[in-house]
Amino acid sequence: VSGTVVTDGEAVEIDVPFEDFLDVTQAGFMLYLEARRDRLFVAFDGTWATLGGASEGVLIDLDVEVRERIYDLRIGYQVFNRELGDPIHRSKFTWQRRGIVDVFIGGRYFRTEPVITLTPIIGDEREISTVDSRIDPFLGLRAGWDMSYRWIIGFRGDIGGFGIGDAAEFSWQAAAEIGFRVSRRVTIFAGYRVLDYDTVSGEGADRNGIELNQHGPIIGGGFLF
């Protein structure tokens, strides 16, 4: 995680390498839900996280906590679905390798609550906090291929913001994943995900928001109903 938190005009730099990420993550959770009918689908992707850290200076101690909520809702359409190779016959079913491509549009809701606590050696403690929320429109693409019955790979990415209303000037997200089918209805996966956005706005003491680049490995499971 790297970026800048701006609260009432006060800017604090954030730079947390992956090996230190668990030390500053106070809580975190991700959830993805998708419903599909033929080529159409709708999906929800949610991230809840609370990050925090502290540093001691010669004249002042600094404590930073950032509560982050990111929810996106998208609707998409499958533009490509093609069989790859010959069918594979199993004892109870026949399976066909496929390559697929989906396109989608949606909206991503950001809510960040940075709290900065300044504790000088001389004088009173000072706490600066704000709440910044906005919705970014976005459009994107997702592709997936079956390498075998067990192994699948997928890529997805989107761009958004575009400076529409209160939206960020530009935001983007990309992810690559490899999955293993445990059964016809259960898949486990691992991958890498990057999310970059800038919600800083205003001038002087009214300048608030967060500019953040989050990236790192992801692991999870998928269940088909």
Label the model's feature ranges.
Residues 25-29, 65-71, 99, 131-137, ...:
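Residues that define the transmembrane beta-barrel architecture of outer-membrane proteins
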Residues 2-9, 54-59, 87-88, 113-123, ...:
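Outer-membrane beta-barrel translocator domains and adjoining extracellular loop/strand segments
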Residues 47-135:
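Outer-membrane pore/translocation modules
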Residues 173, 179-225:
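Predominantly the C-terminal beta-signal and adjacent terminal strand-loop region
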Residues 31-37, 73-77, 105-107, 139-145, ...:
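Residues on the lipid-exposed face of transmembrane beta-strands in outer-membrane beta-barrel proteins
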